[in-house]
From Swiss-Prot:
Localization annotation: Cytoplasm
Catalyzed reactions per annotation: L-aspartate 4-semialdehyde + pyruvate = (2S,4S)-4-hydroxy-2,3,4,5-tetrahydrodipicolinate + H2O + H(+)
The protein's name: 4-hydroxy-tetrahydrodipicolinate synthase
Cited SMART domains: DHDPS
Residue positions of the active site: 144, 172
InterPro entries: Aldolase_TIM (IPR013785), DapA (IPR005263), DapA-like (IPR002220), Schiff_base-form_aldolases_AS (IPR020625), Schiff_base-form_aldolases_CS (IPR020624)
Keywords, in A-Z order: Amino-acid biosynthesis, Cytoplasm, Diaminopimelate biosynthesis, Lyase, Lysine biosynthesis, Schiff base
Record has Cytoplasm as a keyword: yes
Pathway: Amino-acid biosynthesis; L-lysine biosynthesis via DAP pathway; (S)-tetrahydrodipicolinate from L-aspartate: step 3/4
Species of the source: Prochlorococcus marinus (strain NATL2A)
């Protein structure tokens, strides 16, 4: 088994939660609840919080809401945990503006997704990310590859070129395969901190060189995920495998439909009134909710 995760940096810790954005009964961002939820997630074991990412419904948040949400979480957590801001856009100029604002607001890093919809070629991706890195040179960046949502994928060779920017330090791998991690390791070595972007693949990705996970399930089972990662790093592979297998039904249910629909429903079930997603996303249907209740009950979460 590859122990390269032991040799790689983990600049944002091992377990990061891609936090949902709570909405009140009128559909407005509930900033007070966001602060409470962020602190709860850290109490449960999260080393870092990602705000305004995919799970945080960034496409339906205004720039003003995103900025206030980042400032709220940053101020609430203080030095208790790392705070990363989702600053990606399919417009380079907008991504630059958002990343600079994140740096000015005290973020510990920025999660910058591959541009979506306009499907730039690899040369365009290099220009895009290099411009962002150069615009906020002191802010550590986590590049984010999720081709199922963006329609294109950044190649490991381009990532390796971008590493001459000193603030390109990490990568969220959400292509759904361990091969992506292997190729990134081949091109970039151990200096790039690779995080799994898929809860179901945490253990497989750790085994080929990832250092941790940007998780959705950690809203619910952070201690279990923390233990899984620690068990792997300590060489307790049977224990890590047991946790991996035990949590698979939950992982599957949280992605039975578009994220963050299921995790918001799950949070409601365990007592967090985070509200439904904003349109065009909808609430979890009754059949999926019934299955989610069974899984949460089996894990003694409700």
């Amino acid at each position: 088994m590859n122990k390269s995760a032991l040799l790689s940096p983990a600049p944002f810790g091992r377990l990061l939660t891609a936090m949902v954005t709570p909405f009140d009964d009128e559909g407005k961002v509930d900033y007070g609840l966001a602060a409470d939820l962020a602190n709860y997630l850290v109490d449960q074991g999260s080393d870092g919080i990602v705000v305004c990412g995919t799970t945080g419904e960034s496409p339906t948040l205004s720039w003003q809401e995103q900025q206030k949400l980042l400032e709220t979480v940053r101020n609430s957590l203080g030095s208790r945990a790392k705070v990363l801001a989702g600053t990606g856009s399919n417009s380079t100029s907008e991504a630059i503006e958002a990343t600079k604002e994140a740096a000015n607001s005290g973020a510990d890093g920025a999660l910058v997704v591959v541009p979506y919809y306009n499907k730039p070629p690899q040369e365009g991706l290099e220009v895009h990310f290099r411009a962002i890195a150069n615009a906020a040179p002191k802010l550590p960046l986590m590049l984010y590859n999720i081709p199922g949502r963006t329609g294109c994928s950044i190649s490991p060779s381009i990532v390796s070129k971008l590493m001459d920017c000193s603030n390109v330090v990490s990568f969220k791998a959400a292509s759904g395969t361990t091969e992506e991690v292997t190729q990134l390791r081949n091109y970039c070595g151990s200096d790039l901190a690779i995080y799994s972007g898929d809860d179901a693949l945490v253990l497989p990705m750790l085994s080929v060189g990832a250092v941790g996970v940007v998780s959705v399930a950690s809203h619910l089972v952070a201690p279990n995920l923390k233990k899984l990662i620690e068990s792997f790093l300590e060489g307790k592979y049977s224990e890590a495998l047991y946790l991996h297998e035990t949590l698979q039904p939950l992982f599957k249910s949280l992605f039975a439909t578009t994220n963050p629909i299921p995790v918001k429903a799950a949070l409601q079930l365990i007592g967090w009134s985070v509200g439904p997603p904003r349109s065009p996303l909808v609430s979890l249907n009754s059949e999926m909710k019934e299955e989610l209740v069974k899984i949460l009950s089996s894990l003694r979460l409700i």
